[in-house]
A protein has these predicted regions:
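Catalytic histidine-centered segment of alpha/beta-hydrolase-like enzymes
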Residues: 226-235, 239
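Conserved alpha/beta-hydrolase catalytic His-Asp/Glu region
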Residues: 118-120, 134-187
């Protein structure tokens, strides 16, 4: 079964593949779609077991990356694309680079977890306890607020929450929490900007440093004052950062090298 795909912009322009975070769909890139569709060809899929690709199951990093490689090969201008990923999508982007780096021009990966998260073993049983109540409007709102999803996207967020099955959420969380650095990264020279928000846990900064150190063409920066979901919560800064990276211009002043602590 094919993935749901939305395309924007001129087909002959350089392509950008946007890979969304866990639990939401391609709609979460709406601020970037509006900012970049005028001069780039945008590929915005719903990843397996997400949004309108809910029936493409089960989710796994290797399958998702293989599907993204096929998508670039078939739909991207010239058979290659820039890749932009957030959270789960950035993990898929890492695997895509490892297995099909020749298809990727420049990459921007934000909020990429590579390390064990304390208490991860409790998340799956907690999810099953939460599942019967996940569609209660009050809980949907709390979850939306905790993830930094703006009010303007309440309807889309609520719809994705209601559509998601417990099995899908379990598959996605397992893949996310088990993700570690894949083999093959050390040979990569793709220009890659690894990002982390200042307000993310310190483990995410360590992951960013680790990922950047593993790739010859990578560099790690921290976005001052930003949360994990900053492409949606602070799109103006994210869009300036992305455009600067794609056009090989200096990064905004709000971006600083990831500190050692």
């Amino acid at each position: 079964m094919p993935l749901h795909l939305a395309e924007f912009g001129p087909a002959a322009a350089p392509s950008i593949l946007f890979l969304h975070g866990g639990g939401v769909g391609g709609w979460s890139w709406q601020p970037q779609i509006e900012a970049f569709q005028g001069d780039y060809h945008l590929l915005v899929p719903d990843l397996p077991e997400h949004g309108q690709s809910l029936d493409v199951a089960p989710f796994s990093m290797t399958d998702a990356a293989a599907r993204m490689a096929e998508l670039i090969h078939k739909r991207a201008h010239g058979g290659h694309a820039h890749v932009v990923g957030l959270s789960l999508g950035s993990q898929v982007g890492v695997v895509l680079l490892a297995v099909a780096g020749q298809l990727v021009d420049r990459a921007l990966l934000s909020g990429t977890s590579l390390r064990p998260i304390p208490g991860a073993s409790l998340i799956e049983p907690t999810l099953w306890l939460y599942a019967p109540f996940k569609n209660i409007p009050y809980l949907i709102r709390l979850n939306q607020q905790s993830l930094g999803v703006p009010e303007a996207y309440s309807a889309q967020f609520a719809q994705d929450t209601r559509l998601a099955t417990t099995r899908a959420l379990t598959n996605i969380l397992k893949a996310n929490l088990a993700f570690r650095e894949p083999p093959g990264l050390t040979r990569l020279k793709n220009p890659t900007l690894v990002l982390v928000g200042e307000k993310e846990p310190s483990i995410m900064r360590r992951s960013a440093r680790q990922l950047a150190a593993s790739m010859t063409g990578a560099t790690a920066y921290m976005a001052r004052g930003m949360i994990h979901n900053w492409p949606l919560a602070a799109p103006e800064l994210f869009n300036r950062t992305l455009r600067a990276w794609l056009t090989e211009q200096p990064l905004p002043a709000e971006l600083v090298p990831v500190p050692r602590k």
